Amino acid sequence: LYTPERNVWLANSLLEVQPSKEGKNLFSCSKKVNDYLKTTVMGDTLKILLDYPLDQLPQEFKKSKFMGMNIGDMRLDMAKDVGGIINDINSQNIGFKHLEKDSLSIATSNSIVVDSCDFAALQVIRSGGNVDFQSGTINNLYFKLGMMGNLSVNVEKCHIGTEYLTAQYANVQLQKGECERMIWIP
């Protein structure tokens, strides 16, 4: 939440994305934040909005210009037909675990961790924070390097076939053995 008078963010929050065991999308969060989430479905898109009324802030925070809310983690059990994740909740990182998908696009203003996932194609459109590939297989990885922070790949446990890289005004260090082939797209 941002207004000229106040900047509110989620402190230490993680959106954990994992495969759905029931074949449908399920979203869960802590009870204390559930009353302030508004969800709407627009076509094939689930939009989740954190709407905390600033007039209900505890008295000790009413004069604070900056405030981190500690609301706990959120989880999305994702069905196979989901093609993209967009998350712009300020300071909420995303962790992907045990996903097996043909393709997925990710856009976030925060950090991403990919662990034990298999993708035929993964596109990181934007990540304002770090991108950390811990383990898994990605046949084709598409990056816009200028739209992300640091990139890290555990070369012992994460196998990347081809990286398709594009950037403007980017400074990202690529690791030796990070992928089999790298294609630069100016």
What are these model-predicted stretches?
Residues 6-18, 71-186:
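Extended, compositionally simple hydrophobic/Ser/Thr-rich segments
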Residues 1-44:
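Start-of-domain marker
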Residues 26-71, 81:
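Membrane-embedded segments
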